[in-house]
Amino acid sequence: MSSAMQGPAVTSSSTFLSNIIGKPVNVKLHSGMLYQGTLESIDGFMNVALVDASEYYESEQNPVIHRYESDVFLRGTQVMYISEL
């Protein structure tokens, strides 16, 4: 197959997560809560630490429920997805 016909490069989830540390992210929980902040750290259990985070219900179009000036820790079992902003 020629290089022009190849699809996008596949990135492993661990590579993706290590590359977005220090960048702004959305973290959606199974409860429907959405957190936006800077990804400070993440571990193998998907436990997440954010700084300068805002908390929303369902989407960022809804009003901010709370803004956190210090760290926010989210338990990995509650995380539905993490996306880079």
Curated annotation (Swiss-Prot):
Gene3D superfamilies: 2.30.30.100. One of its GO terms (molecular function) is RNA binding. It holds the Pfam family LSM. Keywords: Cytoplasm, mRNA processing, mRNA splicing, Nucleus, Ribonucleoprotein, RNA-binding, rRNA processing, Spliceosome, tRNA processing. Residues 12-85 form the Sm domain. PROSITE patterns: SM (PS52002). GO terms for biological process: deadenylation-dependent decapping of nuclear-transcribed mRNA; maturation of SSU-rRNA; mRNA splicing, via spliceosome; tRNA processing. It comes from the Eukaryota. Belongs to the snRNP Sm proteins family. SmF/LSm6 subfamily. Component of LSm protein complexes, which are involved in RNA processing and may function in a chaperone-like manner, facilitating the efficient association of RNA processing factors with their substrates. Component of the cytoplasmic LSM1-LSM7 complex, which is thought to be involved in mRNA degradation by activating the decapping step in the 5'-to-3' mRNA decay pathway. Component of the nuclear LSM2-LSM8 complex, which is involved in splicing of nuclear mRNAs. This is U6 snRNA-associated Sm-like protein LSm6. It comes from Eremothecium gossypii (strain ATCC 10895 / CBS 109.51 / FGSC 9923 / NRRL Y-1056).
